[in-house]
């Protein structure tokens, strides 16, 4: 799978067996809030996660997409006069759907196009200025995709954070593909909100996300219920409105995220990150010479997700009796699974946490298939 950062750790598998039943985690809830559970230490874990992401507060959510949707819902209430969200043009489809479901409008920041698809931070500033000129208001939010899902480009958040501070516009970092794989420094990058994915990048069973937010927005996010029944006088003052009481991660998702956290912290240290980048760039250095292959995205790679344009394989598929299915079958014969069936025009892969012997086998498999079909 391309989301290799979501592969469970041995510790997570053990926790999954113990806490896989329904509301298992909530059996230990004494305060009516999942984030207040002390045994297992959910509350301590969330404090540690906030330190790890270098942001003031963290709460679990149903997924990174839900984190983005909630941020936009909160800001829509806080700034009703604003209705435009600025996003990079490599943003995930869920960023757009989050905008749409909140009845907001989108303005895209352009990229440089093929083959690198670079985002220029100055285009964010120009887009903000254009929004002010067109509407007379600031954008409600600026969103940057830290690592995009298609090319694995790493975009530096700091220049965008500086621009957002200059204009006093909230800044949301979508770290679904980076939080848990690369170091995250929300303080340094001046991030107001960060959306992370446990099942994509933090070795948790899905679905689970995280929403990190600065203290400036604490009261907006953690707004307590104030409703009271007219007959029963029922009230639920400890419940958080935006989460319908509690985030829906009551058992396996949250406990596996917690169990994997020590491993996630270790693997995001500089030495481990550098080792993973050596692996992905090792593969690319050995296939870069092949005519009919084009590596898309910025190089050298700073994230292990790769998009390889493969017109040479497409040409083989046109005359092969198995058409586009031939490529998946060739990899399967070599002990490599996970390729999309019928696709020969592009190859997306993620080398994260493969051993060096697996990296070399994968590289050899690509070269072997090329040799078989006289692709040089």
Give residue ranges: language-model regions.
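Short acidic loop-to-helix transition motifs that present clustered carboxylates
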Residues: 65-68, 92-93, 114-117, 176-181
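Active-site phosphate-binding strand-loop segment of PLP-dependent enzymes
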Residues: 117-175, 180
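Active-site C-terminal subdomain of aminotransferase-like
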Residues: 198-291, 297-299
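Conserved active-site segment immediately N-terminal to the catalytic lysine
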Residues: 186-199
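Conserved PLP-binding catalytic core of the aspartate aminotransferase-like
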Residues: 277, 281, 293-330
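PLP-dependent aminotransferase-like
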Residues: 77-138
